[in-house]
Amino acid sequence: MISQNPFDPKGFLTLAETLASNPAGDQATYRSALSRAYYAVFLVARESLTTKGVISPSFSASDHGLVIRTLRSLNRQVGDQLDKLRRKRNRADYVLTTQVSQAEAMQTVATANALRTKL
């Protein structure tokens, strides 16, 4: 049976913390931590802005830019931080020559946790 409760994006942050804290992690582990950390914050931000009636998301790739631009218009620092997380996520997901260390993964998760509390 499928649950009728919506997914809580904080679960992505919990997963990111688990992945980043694994000292035996490999590139797939640490890259996934960056990706999940970004998506946790992005989804919380999108839902918050939608619930407040600030945006009408299309539930497509264009929502990433929409959320970042909207956050920047409301609080430049928060929007810039989310954009930085997105760029890290893009690098981790698409640039195969990039190396992501455990330290970078842990720092990214910490940044995502701090940013989530500002939303």
Question: How would you name each of these model-derived features?
Answer:
Residues 1-119:
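Terminal alpha-helical segments
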